Curated annotation (Swiss-Prot):
Subcellular location(s) of the protein: Cytoplasm
Presence of keyword Transferase: no
Keywords: Antiviral defense, Cytoplasm
Upper lineage: Bacteria, Thermotogati, Thermotogota, Thermotogae, Thermotogales
Organism expressing this protein natively: Thermotoga maritima (strain ATCC 43589 / DSM 3109 / JCM 10099 / NBRC 100826 / MSB8)
Protein name listed in UniProt: CRISPR system Cmr subunit Cmr5
Pfam families: Cas_Cmr5
Length: 129
């Protein structure tokens, strides 16, 4: 079990991610909210199945730039690594440790984007109204 200070740091970081995700999701244009929500709902499983690089390439190819941008901003915030997504897109070498750190961060970020998306953009309970 971690010390009280470690637990407080984790809670603070989690709160920071939640706020960042909320701010990012709120900037999604009204006419793109349904697509964005659908994309972030599947983001975590996509990262698990295809890895971070595969997910980013797929999303870019499909024109899901807002999701990629938001994921990149959150990964940078969590890892303190600048331009991870851009570096991956430019095929810049990343050592295994940096890549895995970014991929683990991406999973945490995907969770917050999904949660905020469901709350702010409609979620399942509002799909029938």
């Amino acid at each position: 079990m971690g010390t009280c200070l470690e637990v407080m740091k984790m809670k603070t970081l989690s709160l920071e991610l939640a706020k960042l995700a909320m701010n990012l999701v709120e900037e999604v244009e009204k006419d793109k909210r349904d697509d964005y929500l659908r994309d972030v709902k599947g983001l975590g499983s996509m990262i698990v199945q295809n890895g971070l690089m595969g997910t980013i390439l797929f999303l870019k190819k499909k024109g899901k730039n807002k999701v990629v941008d938001h994921l990149g901003k959150m990964i940078e915030h969590l890892t303190l690594e600048d331009g991870i997504v851009e570096r991956l897109m430019e095929n810049e070498f990343l050592d295994a440790r940096t890549y895995l750190k970014a991929q683990i961060a991406a999973l945490e970020c995907a969770k917050w984007l999904k949660r905020c998306g469901e709350v702010l953009l409609g979620g399942e309970e509002n799909e029938t109204t």
